[in-house]
Amino acid sequence: MLRDLFVKKKKYAAIPSEQVRKDVPDGVMTKCPKCKKIMYTKEVLKNLKVCVNCGYHHPMNAWERLDSILDEGSFREYDKEMVSLNPLEFPNYEEKLESDRKKTELNEAVVTGEGTIDDMLVVVAVMDSRFRMGSMGSVVGEKIARAVEKAYDLQVPFIIFTASGGARMQEGILSLMQMAKTSVALKKHSNAGGLFISVMTHPTTGGVSASFASIGDYNLAEPGALIGFAGRRVIEQTVREKLPEDFQTAEFLLEHGQLDAVVHRDDMRESLRKILEVHQGGEMAVWQS
């Protein structure tokens, strides 16, 4: 008995039963990946998917983004039925596309169309990273190019929200061609006096960051967005140097002159409205000359 006093007792942890776990339905709570605070999902959604504790910007899907910037009921979608095929017969590509269509209820990684911001007509494209990580394949490039051409025809500004892992590897050179195609369409729009606003969200990388995302008349970004071409580890191994902690963040790019502004999501619609308002007179004068 005396010996038992000196024996280290085992510590046990209570493991929640399945019944306890089921008391909180899926989707009710959201954990912030930055500050780790657990919040009611409805509270996060009400705050435009921005953490109420630390300001972290959670990813938005395409429809949430459109709802946050456009006048209610003003959006009209373009090219909704366009879908990707498998021209290079890449293994399992069709199955992955179909899986993403079911998961996201989208046909591709970008939604394009027209709508109004404070009654000012714009053509808008919004990339959705849930679909193949927002990668740019031939259909994504085609939809963006067509949207730019529509903005040119309507003589209205073009706005894009980017969120992409870059070119889509399953489409090879056909994917890389979209970098040139979209850039040429934007050049035509620009030469005619058209306004182009690019808003980079997390993440904007690879061929998307190296093409249309970076050539706006105004280049904006959301706080903390990862923006860059190659990955951090690849660059460090190439230059054999340790990169700054904030390298490839929106704030780093702003400090080094690659962005015009970092705009909080709460202020995005108003910032776009002000830019559009400033360019209304000048832009129309160019179109009509």
Swiss-Prot record:
Protein name as annotated: Acetyl-coenzyme A carboxylase carboxyl transferase subunit beta
Enzyme class name: transferase
Function: Component of the acetyl coenzyme A carboxylase (ACC) complex. Biotin carboxylase (BC) catalyzes the carboxylation of biotin on its carrier protein (BCCP) and then the CO(2) group is transferred by the transcarboxylase to acetyl-CoA to form malonyl-CoA.
Reported cofactor(s): Zn(2+)
InterPro entries hit by this protein: AcCoA_carboxyl_beta, Acetyl_CoA_COase_Trfase_b_su, ClpP/crotonase-like_dom_sf, COA_CT_N, Znf-ACC
Cofactor binding, note field: Binds 1 zinc ion per subunit.
Gene: accD
One Pfam family from the record: Carboxyl_trans
GO cellular component: acetyl-CoA carboxylase complex
Pathway: Lipid metabolism; malonyl-CoA biosynthesis; malonyl-CoA from acetyl-CoA: step 1/1
Ranges annotated as C4-type zinc finger: 32-54
Organism name: Bacillus thuringiensis (strain Al Hakam)
One GO term of the biological process aspect: malonyl-CoA biosynthetic process
